[in-house]
């Protein structure tokens, strides 16, 4: 496979620098000089907040006390992650809570598949992080109405959260159908990049999984090239290959419609060596 000209795969988890650990943003594209003459880091987000209608159930879950224990930082203000440095501690009150297998899902959307997975594996703890408040509210509402004890929800930037967590902390990190950022000038916003994967991988336990899926073919091959070239991760389907959708990842309505229209879906599972 020839290397994409925009990809530098010469990064690995062990080479994560102090600068990468301490960045105030999830990526940067250089410095800008402000009117005061000082240099400021330009923020490059991997996500874009959407303004959509919030239904009554989602609004209820964001405000009613019976849902509050699902919402880790709902009272902190928009996306404030201050003090969130141990996801296992969020389940400390549960039997074996801090010792149970831990999954982090990045960008769970409206939360349907996230909640379905949590309900199917009650002995595994699930943390979801999202910036879309209607999705956060809906997810919390579903968790509450199903009385799930193994779910926690965080509002904020996943990369910033991962920087705050200990090394070797998470058993499985999931990233399903991330924004493909199709335009070339936006490729720097793609979540799967060597620099961001260094941050992701340091948080994974030895033997932990990074699992991603996309319905954009170009992004699928971009991801397999980045991840196959990343020291410390092993493609479970073999270099250059994709895996079949595992049984534990539910098929969404959107995915079914796409497949019915002839669109492909590509899954990738990588093990931390």
Swiss-Prot record:
Binding site for substrate: 183, 215, 252-255
Comp. bias (Polar residues): 1-31
EC number(s) stated in the UniProt entry for this protein: 2.1.1.33
Superkingdom of the source species: Bacteria
Binding site for S-adenosyl-L-methionine: 105, 130, 157, 179
Native organism: Psychrobacter cryohalolentis (strain ATCC BAA-1226 / DSM 17306 / VKM B-2378 / K5)
InterPro entries noted in UniProt: SAM-dependent_MTases_sf, tRNA_(Gua-N-7)_MeTrfase_Trmb, tRNA_methyltr_TrmB_bact
Record protein name field: tRNA (guanine-N(7)-)-methyltransferase
Transmembrane segments: none
Gene3D superfamilies: Vaccinia Virus protein VP39 (3.40.50.150)
Pfam families per the UniProt record, alphabetical: Methyltransf_4 (PF02390)
Region ranges (Disordered): 1-36
HAMAP family given in the database record: tRNA_methyltr_TrmB
């Amino acid at each position: 496979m020839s290397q994409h000209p925009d990809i530098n795969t010469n990064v690995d988890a062990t080479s994560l620098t102090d600068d990468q650990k301490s960045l105030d943003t999830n990526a940067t594209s250089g410095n800008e000089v402000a009117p005061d003459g000082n240099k400021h880091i330009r923020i490059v987000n991997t996500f874009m907040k959407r303004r959509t209608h919030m239904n009554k159930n989602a609004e209820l879950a964001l405000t009613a006390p019976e849902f509050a224990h699902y919402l880790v930082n709902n009272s902190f203000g928009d996306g404030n992650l201050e003090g969130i440095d141990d996801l296992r501690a969020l389940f400390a009150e549960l039997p074996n809570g801090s010792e149970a297998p831990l999954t982090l899902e990045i960008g769970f959307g409206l939360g349907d598949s996230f909640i379905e997975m949590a309900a199917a594996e009650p002995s595994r703890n699930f943390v979801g992080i999202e910036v879309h408040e209607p999705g956060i509210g809906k997810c919390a509402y579903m968790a509450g109405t199903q009385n799930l004890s193994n779910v926690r929800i965080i509002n904020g930037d996943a990369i910033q959260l991962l920087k705050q967590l200990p090394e070797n902390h998470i058993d499985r990190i999931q990233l399903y159908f991330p924004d493909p950022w199709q335009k070339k000038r936006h490729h720097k916003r793609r979540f799967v990049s060597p620099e961001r994967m260094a941050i992701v991988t340091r948080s994974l336990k030895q033997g932990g999984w990074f699992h991603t899926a996309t319905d954009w073919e170009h992004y699928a091959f971009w991801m397999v090239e980045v991840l196959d070239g990343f020291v410390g991760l092993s493609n479970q389907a073999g270099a250059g290959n994709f895996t079949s959708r595992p049984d534990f990842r539910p098929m969404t309505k959107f995915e079914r419609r796409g497949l019915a229209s002839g669109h492909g879906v590509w899954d990738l599972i990588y093990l931390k060596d």
